[in-house]
Amino acid sequence: MTKFLLAVGSGGFVGSILRFLIFKYFENPQTTGWPWGTFTVNILGSLLAGILFGISEKTNLIPETLSLFLLVGFCGGFTTFSAFALDNLKLFQAGAFMQNFLYISATILLGVLAIFIGHFLATSVLK
């Protein structure tokens, strides 16, 4: 059990740091009008989760500990629904209702599409 906890924790550590760096790369959403950092990590994280899940479904290439590190730890630390929710609150409070609606719609649609694409790519390559 300890090795699983360490795998999840260290994956979360790495994912959170990468998320922070991506947030820093993009401008402040209050100046651009769009929370690019959160949007980017959620779409990329969904794509990666789809790829990893597809590989796990078709092969035994990813041991359980590595799967926990990548899917639960890294993807969990990298993507962030709470930041997505907070971005929406800020857009709403700023009166940016159309941007708020577009951000919610685009994140959900592209996030789900990205996980399907990632899964398709992984399972197609591994046939």
Where are these regions (language model features)?
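Membrane-interface helix-loop junctions in multi-pass transporters/channels
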Residues: 1-127
